[in-house]
Regions:
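Thiol/selenol-based redox catalytic cores and closely related redox-interacting motifs
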Residues: 95-187
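Extracytoplasmic thiol/disulfide redox context detector
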Residues: 4, 12-98, 140-163, 181-216
Length: 216
């Protein structure tokens, strides 16, 4: 059905960065048009936020995806320094336990903490390689959780995107931008530097609970 993106070196990284340098008068590249669609449709998803930075990055991940795990690790610094807010959009389709793990994260009282458990214990479940969180059994997955996960997956499927991780954001030039895979740290730093800053918001815990998307 789907796949993960094995692009640790991201051969397309240079081309992606070149897209950002196109002058405003140039026709919008198809990749950036696709990013615009993702931003327009993100309100139909359920995400939870980690971090308090004014730069907002949406990331679609599967709990059992090793490249999603790499990207999670590489985003620790910007998130923990308060430079970045990541809005995690969870899907569950890669393996037989992905749905149960995705549901366990979404139904947790603190989804950010649940995702951290999944990532910090990644690869340590001998009987179930992948994310470290215990998957929920079928009967424990609430109907609203199934609907939320289906809507999250539909964001990808409706745009003919079938690999994770998938990241997208509003760039400083006002247009959408996206990338796939887990870029090397130096490339990731350049990509994150392109993100526009949102206006300062009232205080509060941005990662307390899942919510319907409200970004773009």
């Amino acid at each position: 059905m789907g796949r993960l993106l094995p692009r640790p070196a991201l051969a397309l990284a240079g081309a992606l960065l070149a897209l950002a340098a196109l002058p405003a008068g140039a026709g919008m590249h198809p990749t950036r048009l696709l990013a615009e669609r993702l931003l327009a449709e993100v309100d139909d998803t359920t995400w939870f936020a980690e971090g308090t930075g004014r730069k907002v990055l949406y990331v679609v991940i599967d709990p059992n995806c090793p490249y999603c795990h790499k990207l999670w690790e590489r985003l620790r610094g910007p998130v923990e320094r308060g430079e970045l807010q990541v809005r995690w959009i969870i899907v569950g389709y890669l393996t037989s336990t992905s749905l149960g793990k995705a549901a366990a994260i979404l139904q947790a009282e603190d989804p950010v903490a649940a995702l951290r458990v999944n990532e910090e214990d990644f690869g340590f479940r001998d009987e179930d390689p992948g994310g470290g969180i215990e998957p929920l059994p079928e009967e424990a997955i609430r109907d609203e959780t199934r609907l939320a996960l289906a809507a999250n997956l539909a964001l990808m499927q409706n745009n003919n995107l079938f690999g994770v991780p998938l990241a997208f954001f509003r760039a400083a030039d006002g247009r959408g931008f996206m990338f796939e895979g887990a870029p090397p740290p130096d490339v990731l730093k350049e990509l994150l530097s392109l993100i526009d800053e949102e206006p300062a918001a009232p205080g509060g815990d941005p990662g307390a609970a899942p919510r319907a998307g409200s970004g773009g």
